[in-house]
Amino acid sequence: MSSILPIIDAGLPTGIVEPFAARVGRDAETLTRDSLSELQINLGKLCNQTCTHCHVDAGPTKTAENMSPETATRICELVDACESLTTIDLTGGAPELNPSFRSLVTHFRGNGLRVIDRCNLTILSEPGQEDLSDFL
């Protein structure tokens, strides 16, 4: 016994499959933001690793994409103006390799914010990072 399944043209209403937009329009709830409590900040693509699974394509040669000190200063100003923030999530590459990393952490913690460092842990064995775990 063989049967042939119908070919459904997604652009035409068939009654078999409800179009996505119609379903969302019928069942969706309105989403609203209460307040911004967590902000993730990417400090650049510079990293001590070259992982094939890296979603930002970070690596040791990615210096051009590093956040500038001027941008870091502006980020601090914007964060200071947002009273609802409780957490700053620093990521990269290896955020610790950005020259502004420690001053950013110091600034945010000095303002009572929780700081998350998305660390690959191998950075702890890099020259100049020996005290990183104590700093954090």
Per-segment meaning from a language model:
Residues 2-119, 124-130, 134:
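Conserved alpha-helical substructure of the radical SAM core
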